[in-house]
Amino acid sequence: MPPLPPPAANPGWRLAPPGRRRYKDWMPEGIVVVRDGRIESRELRRLVDLFFEDMVKYVVDVERGAVAVGGEMHADGEEALLEEGSRQPDLWGANYYPGRGREECIEYTSLINIRPAQGNRSMEIQDPAVRERVRELTFARIGEGEALP
């Protein structure tokens, strides 16, 4: 695999500085891990505004119940949860759209969801049980599609 080009050649990329691999060292303000309770609405607003303006990417650990909210890519949240002890097979990515209501606020799509070994051959979460668990944890840790202040 060829090496990645330098950041100047890819201004949209945020590469970790040399010798700093942990997400906390290079994107501490861009990801919030919620282990219990719900993320504060002002913090969620900050993350929505920081990256995409109308949505936020997040990753759910369906076994431990933790959720990593934020980041430019789902892989950022995945890395955050892996560093905290999650197992990769338990991590699923989705997008949250505040203000769309309960039925429209979750998009179950992410590149990290492509895993043929687990029977998921698509970016979208295909297993109904996994989708339901992601939905439960989204409502418990992030929100139910209500508008943000």
Task: Label each PLM-derived region with a short phrase.
Residues A8-A9, A16:
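Ala/Thr-enriched low-complexity intrinsically disordered regions
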Residues R38-A80:
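Negatively charged, low-complexity tracts enriched in Asp/Glu with abundant Ser/Thr
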Residues E72-E103:
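Amphipathic, interaction-prone secondary-structure segments
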Residues M123-P149:
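Well-ordered alpha/beta subsegment
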